[in-house]
Amino acid sequence: VTTIAFDPYSDAQRDDPYPAYAEARRHSPVTKLPNGDYAVARYEDVSYVLRHPELFSSTAMMRAMTNVFGSAEGAAKLTPSELARIAQLMERMPKLGEMMAARNMIASDPPVHGPMRNLVNRGFTPRRMAHLETRVREIARASLAEIERKPEFDIVSDFFVPLPVTVIAELLGVEHERKEDFKHWSDCAVAGATGGAGAMGPVDVVEGFTGLSQYLTEIVEKRRRDPQDDLISTLIRAEEGETALTPLEVVMFVSVLLVAGNETTTNLLGNTLIALMQHPDELARVRRDPDRIPAVVEEGLRYDGPIQFLFRQARQDVELAGVKIPAGAIVLPLLGSANRDDAQFPHADRFDPSRNTQGHLAFGLGIHFCLGASLARLEARIALEELLPRFAAFERVEPHVKYVDSYLVRGPKRLPLRAQTSL
């Protein structure tokens, strides 16, 4: 087994992970990391991991959702006041441990996974997506109307954040007026998956999760008394039997959907706009021909996707690319690396919306293929359709992009622009 330096907390890895991915694909397609995990870099092997839940369990995804302290060493560094604050928060949420252990779709395997996915699928039907198109466009236009009044604006906080937050809030049936809270809670979830990397520490993460859980618990109770035409009510009305969800499971489900429903689209749009600005010929081409926007979105997903990897756990001893992975080991299928594999996508480091992107892994593969993929594609397409004609040109205010403090999620933390409005 080859061990290479792979530090997910390093600025270099966070700001540009692709050179390290390329090195891994060439020299160590399955790499044992310093912490004992195994990173899988090539498209063929990543696909294999995702296609075989009988060998690689998704229950390891709970690690991404609960890795608040990063490690035992990280927890040991907490001050007495921080430990006291966390204990105080835990007292306010006596069922927090039970909630984190509740069934949820992204961290489950067959036979539990299928019925749960079918249940949530009811909120993402083609009919509902078609109905959403008009509403997504209304939200996009309202945000852009505000932006037009500003000489400079942060396209992330002013447009790429509020659009998906508002959409997923309305779909779930929560108050989109609290979108700033939702974004903060999502940021806490992302920070939790980084082990408290960056500016947000473990206390912030626990406070955020506690706030989200308390809010959603109240909403679920309201929907039990007064059902509405929304996804939370659909989950509560689940038919009796194996699929029926407990109140805590509904809260956990909605927490996951709320976070995933806005982080994915926000970062997809941020990364794709950066790629277009770095490739002015492509930007000019899509301005001339808006019908190219769906292809731009797909290439954005492949070229610089919002989720860099997933977590799996080996159910048994398994050999992959000549490397023996022991039962119980955590395995990281690197989606971002697989999508840059020349063996699958020739000249993969080139941003080329004309290429065949079929088979990219930005939304995963197999039974855990992202349930909200159609919604993310819809939001991204409409956002670009409304954004690009409105401004004749963009100019970056800051020369360097600051990315979110996460190795799991990739996207610009902010992207201040100076734009010239189209006449």
Model-inferred region functions:
Residues V1-L423:
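Cytochrome P450
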